[in-house]
């Protein structure tokens, strides 16, 4: 019975994870149509690619027996993420392309090192421990990536940038693999996905709290969420503070300008008469 339950949660995790892997398709279709990556960051796709590669390697029978479902979904995810990275490299500007190539080189180096060490220097339980630790570290990093979005939701009191279905999928995916890991008594699967389940739950709670809030304006939210340009963010924040401090003076100045415009118009009419 336990074996059947574990298989069920593994298959469920495969289906939900596939949805998560395919969720950026709209973004990349936009990149292809505009032939530009605009302000999108390619870092998450490189990190997800590394996580998928390490997890797929960990699930192989000679590394971790009875975890083939881990390999199937992460192998599929590796292909999907690799396609995203290639598209990004094609349409990115030179500076972003060089950064992506550097990250891709780092991803390839880390994965190659893990594979070679596990094959040539380790065996049995030692191999499983080494590969499991590597996969766990990067899985937790991947699940922690939405923390910046959660911070943005709290600051703006708006869930505009945190879609409900995506948050629900993160929660369900993490929960499915967490239970799968528990049933298989595998901490390298249970721990990172337990973290993912918890963070997904936190996103759902934030959604329940702020779903009816108007929140900040889209322009203000975009300004606060632009992590790629810290200098510009600082300027916007300073301008917002200055506007708040000088609100009364601004109203008076506007009224004075309106009076001046009205007087100028009257003088112009009088001169014409």
UniProtKB/Swiss-Prot annotation:
<feature type="transmembrane region" description="Helical; Name=6">
    <location>
        <begin position="164"/>
        <end position="184"/>
    </location>
</feature>
<feature type="topological domain" description="Cytoplasmic">
    <location>
        <begin position="150"/>
        <end position="163"/>
    </location>
</feature>
<dbReference type="GO" id="GO:0016020">
    <property type="term" value="C:membrane"/>
</dbReference>
<keyword id="KW-1003">Cell membrane</keyword>
<feature type="topological domain" description="Cytoplasmic">
    <location>
        <begin position="210"/>
        <end position="273"/>
    </location>
</feature>
<comment type="subunit">
    <text>Forms homooligomers and/or heterooligomers.</text>
</comment>
<feature type="transmembrane region" description="Helical; Name=1">
    <location>
        <begin position="7"/>
        <end position="27"/>
    </location>
</feature>
<feature type="topological domain" description="Extracellular">
    <location>
        <begin position="64"/>
        <end position="71"/>
    </location>
</feature>
<protein>
    <recommendedName>
        <fullName>Bidirectional sugar transporter SWEET1a</fullName>
    </recommendedName>
</protein>
<keyword id="KW-0762">Sugar transport</keyword>
<dbReference type="InterPro" id="IPR004316">
    <property type="entry name" value="SWEET_rpt"/>
</dbReference>
<feature type="domain" description="MtN3/slv 1">
    <location>
        <begin position="7"/>
        <end position="95"/>
    </location>
</feature>
<feature type="topological domain" description="Extracellular">
    <location>
        <begin position="1"/>
        <end position="6"/>
    </location>
</feature>
<feature type="topological domain" description="Extracellular">
    <location>
        <begin position="185"/>
        <end position="188"/>
    </location>
</feature>
<feature type="topological domain" description="Cytoplasmic">
    <location>
        <begin position="93"/>
        <end position="101"/>
    </location>
</feature>
<feature type="transmembrane region" description="Helical; Name=2">
    <location>
        <begin position="43"/>
        <end position="63"/>
    </location>
</feature>
<keyword id="KW-0813">Transport</keyword>
<dbReference type="InterPro" id="IPR047664">
    <property type="entry name" value="SWEET"/>
</dbReference>
<feature type="topological domain" description="Extracellular">
    <location>
        <begin position="123"/>
        <end position="128"/>
    </location>
</feature>
<feature type="transmembrane region" description="Helical; Name=7">
    <location>
        <begin position="189"/>
        <end position="209"/>
    </location>
</feature>
<keyword id="KW-0472">Membrane</keyword>
<keyword id="KW-0812">Transmembrane</keyword>
<keyword id="KW-0677">Repeat</keyword>
<feature type="transmembrane region" description="Helical; Name=4">
    <location>
        <begin position="102"/>
        <end position="122"/>
    </location>
</feature>
<dbReference type="GO" id="GO:0005886">
    <property type="term" value="C:plasma membrane"/>
</dbReference>
<dbReference type="GO" id="GO:0008643">
    <property type="term" value="P:carbohydrate transport"/>
</dbReference>
<dbReference type="GO" id="GO:0051119">
    <property type="term" value="F:sugar transmembrane transporter activity"/>
</dbReference>
<keyword id="KW-1133">Transmembrane helix</keyword>
<feature type="topological domain" description="Cytoplasmic">
    <location>
        <begin position="28"/>
        <end position="42"/>
    </location>
</feature>
<feature type="transmembrane region" description="Helical; Name=5">
    <location>
        <begin position="129"/>
        <end position="149"/>
    </location>
</feature>
<feature type="domain" description="MtN3/slv 2">
    <location>
        <begin position="131"/>
        <end position="214"/>
    </location>
</feature>
<comment type="function">
    <text>Mediates both low-affinity uptake and efflux of sugar across the plasma membrane.</text>
</comment>
<feature type="transmembrane region" description="Helical; Name=3">
    <location>
        <begin position="72"/>
        <end position="92"/>
    </location>
</feature>
<dbReference type="Pfam" id="PF03083">
    <property type="entry name" value="MtN3_slv"/>
</dbReference>
<comment type="similarity">
    <text>Belongs to the SWEET sugar transporter family.</text>
</comment>
